[in-house]
């Protein structure tokens, strides 16, 4: 009976598993979407007064041109794999064996850390996606370069795809964090109830024992 009382409520387990599944799915989606943001051809129209006479010069842009995006793909992929392990331990191992008790806290820290760090780095890179053109001007991929006096086209799809991937990574981090918080609160609540119940039963047992001796 004492072991049964220590089990976390079913709704806690259900919410935790749902959060982990959602986090894993979002992490996979973020990695896939970011990794397919490639071979985007951006056309930069140089100013007519420049040496290039207003000619549109093509530049192929891919996510691998930006290290933070590469980091996000790797981190999201690893996080999804680790979450799959966590789901296996919770669903099939029931969290009972020693290996599960050791791994679950580590996974609970590692997965959000990976996702949050990768998302933060990607957000910083998204705010300044640009490259240096042949005439030495810094060209923004998502918007025209006012300083150069020219314009950029062809980067809309790339920018949209990158932005969505970053937000998916953030959503995955939040989902995993919520699952961990719910699991932690549920476990502490069930543990506290078990201690109080055992304490009260112990006290009542002592009282009954004393009364029995009086007779």
Swiss-Prot record:
Cellular compartment(s): Cell membrane
Disulfide bonds: none
Top-rank taxon: Eukaryota
Compositionally biased intervals (Low complexity): 195-205
Region Disordered, annotated ranges: 187-215
Subunit structure: Homodimer and heterodimers.
Main localization (coarse): membrane
InterPro entries in the cross-refs: CASP_dom (IPR006702), CASPL (IPR044173)
Transmembrane intervals: 14-34, 69-89, 106-126, 162-182
Protein name: CASP-like protein 1U3
Signal peptide: none
Membrane topology: Multi-pass membrane protein
Cellular component, GO annotation: plasma membrane
Key words, A-Z: Cell membrane, Membrane, Transmembrane, Transmembrane helix
Record-stated family: Belongs to the Casparian strip membrane proteins (CASP) family.
A Pfam family hit: CASP_dom
Phylogenetic classification of the source organism: Eukaryota, Viridiplantae, Streptophyta, Embryophyta, Tracheophyta
The keyword Transmembrane is annotated on this UniProt entry: yes
Keyword match Transmembrane: yes
All ranges on the Extracellular side of the membrane: 35-68, 127-161
Cytoplasmic domain ranges by topology: 1-13, 90-105, 183-215
């Amino acid at each position: 009976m004492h072991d049964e009382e220590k089990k976390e409520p079913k709704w806690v387990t259900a919410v935790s598993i749902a959060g982990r599944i959602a986090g894993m799915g979002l992490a996979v989606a973020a990695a896939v979407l970011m990794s397919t943001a490639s071979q985007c051809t951006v056309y930069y129209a140089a100013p007519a007064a420049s040496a290039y006479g207003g000619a549109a010069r093509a530049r192929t842009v891919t996510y691998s041109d930006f290290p933070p995006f590469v980091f996000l793909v790797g981190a999201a992929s690893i996080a999804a794999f680790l979450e799959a392990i966590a789901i296996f331990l919770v669903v099939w191992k029931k969290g009972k064996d020693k290996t599960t008790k050791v791994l679950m806290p580590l996974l609970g820290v590692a997965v959000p850390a990976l996702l949050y760090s990768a998302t933060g780095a990607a957000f910083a890179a998204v705010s300044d996606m640009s490259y240096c053109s042949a005439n030495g001007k810094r060209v923004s991929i998502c918007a025209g370069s006012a300083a150069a006096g020219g314009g950029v086209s062809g980067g809309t799809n790339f920018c949209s795809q990158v932005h969505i991937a970053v937000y998916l990574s953030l959503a995955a981090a939040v989902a995993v964090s919520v699952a961990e918080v719910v699991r932690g609160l549920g476990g502490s609540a069930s543990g506290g109830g078990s201690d109080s119940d055992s304490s009260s039963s112990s006290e009542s047992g002592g009282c009954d024992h004393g009364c029995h001796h009086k007779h």
